[in-house]
């Protein structure tokens, strides 16, 4: 993010920063154990506060100002912001609803068995499938294990439950087992899609922010830079929120890190698309800014805050959310 360069390059640099901070957060899986939930919940609360502040000062406020300066809406200058905000929230909601249609209603047991190959299970290994407790996880906002603990938590089933892996593989010949293994990897790819899909609006927000520079007095390079920094800050604990539960479920540390940073890889692509689209359709800019804000606020209220509150650390998450809001507000007002 260097002042004076084209919006496309600025957007690329900004979203590469947000991706890099996602990877940095995911790398904490090498340091923290899966049992240190307080750190994760406090970080998620801080991220929620940062995103809420950024959604107003870096997105909604410029959108309203652009509508007012256009002299097209008069006293209804709030309409583009309201419409864009609603459509942005609806976009993320519909993306959530699409997940079950893609197969997310199935038990994602394959996540806990990423290190296993697809050959049939031998008799001596079958006993391992009936352990005292079986670990699994939930990631994202999909509908996995609705009767269990909230998203991102490792939960334990009671003894005596037969592993789905045993049900699927124990009686299969090698060809059938290989087919089942391919199906498991398909579900893994779908799960990665669920993890990354809500990062698309964040990448769009950065791209739209840089594409809007100079359109109004409040649409400045500093505001766009602060928005990218804010989203990068909230991506830091988000990377850990993906990698830490995977590690707790038995996935190797390196694979947990890989899948954690992968969730931020989509942001540079979305950011570039946002900048290019705004350059081609400038009248849509107020709607686009509000769209990004609505998507971000929906993610915060539907995903980040509930997950931060799910494990008994609600007060900690609430206060770190307040602190995150103040930090981002100070960045936007003081450095904008």
Swiss-Prot record:
InterPro entries: ZIP. One of its GO terms (molecular function) is zinc ion transmembrane transporter activity. It is a multi-pass membrane protein. GO terms for cellular component: cytoplasm; Golgi apparatus; nucleus; plasma membrane. The chain crosses the membrane at residues 12-32, 44-64, 75-95, 188-208, 258-278, 280-300, 316-336. Keywords: Cell membrane, Cytoplasm, Golgi apparatus, Ion transport, Membrane, Nucleus, Transmembrane, Transmembrane helix, Transport, Zinc, Zinc transport. It is found in: Cell membrane; Nucleus; Cytoplasm; Golgi apparatus. It holds the Pfam family Zip. Belongs to the ZIP transporter (TC 2.A.5) family. Functions as a cellular zinc transporter. This is Zinc transporter ZIP11.
């Amino acid at each position: 993010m260097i002042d004076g360069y084209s919006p496309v390059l600025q957007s690329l640099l900004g979203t590469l920063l947000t991706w890099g901070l996602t990877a940095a957060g995911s790398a904490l899986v090498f340091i923290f154990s899966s049992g240190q939930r307080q750190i994760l919940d406090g970080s998620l609360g801080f991220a929620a506060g940062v995103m809420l502040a950024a959604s107003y000062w870096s997105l909604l406020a410029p959108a309203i100002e652009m509508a007012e300066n256009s002299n097209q809406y008069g006293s209804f200058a709030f309409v583009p912001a309201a419409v864009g905000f609603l459509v942005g929230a609806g976009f993320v909601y519909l993306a959530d609803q699409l997940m079950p249609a893609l197969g997310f209603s199935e038990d994602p047991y394959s996540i806990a068995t990423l290190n296993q190959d697809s050959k049939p299970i031998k008799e001596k290994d079958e006993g391992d499938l009936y352990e005292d407790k079986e670990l699994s996880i939930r990631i994202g906002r999909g509908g996995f294990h609705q009767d269990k603990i909230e998203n991102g938590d490792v939960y334990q089933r009671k003894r005596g439950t037969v592993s789905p892996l045993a049900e699927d593989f124990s009686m299969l010949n090698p060809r059938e087992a290989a087919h089942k293994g391919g199906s498991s990897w398909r579900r893994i790819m779908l799960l990665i899609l669920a993890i990354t899909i809500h990062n698309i609006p964040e990448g769009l927000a950065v791209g739209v922010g840089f594409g809007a520079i100079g359109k109004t007095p409040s649409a400045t390079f500093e505001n766009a830079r602060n928005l990218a920094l804010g989203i990068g800050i909230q991506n830091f604990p988000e990377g850990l929120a993906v990698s830490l539960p995977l590690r707790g479920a038995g996935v190797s540390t390196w694979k947990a890190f890989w899948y954690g940073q992968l969730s931020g890889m989509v942001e540079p692509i979305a950011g570039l698309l946002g900048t290019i689209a705004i350059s081609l359709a400038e009248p849509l800019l107020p709607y686009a800014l509000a769209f990004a804000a609505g998507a971000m606020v929906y993610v915060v209220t539907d995903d980040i805050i509930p997950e931060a509150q799910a494990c008994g650390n609600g007060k900690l998450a609430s206060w770190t959310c307040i602190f995150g809001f103040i930090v981002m507000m100070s960045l936007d007002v003081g450095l904008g």
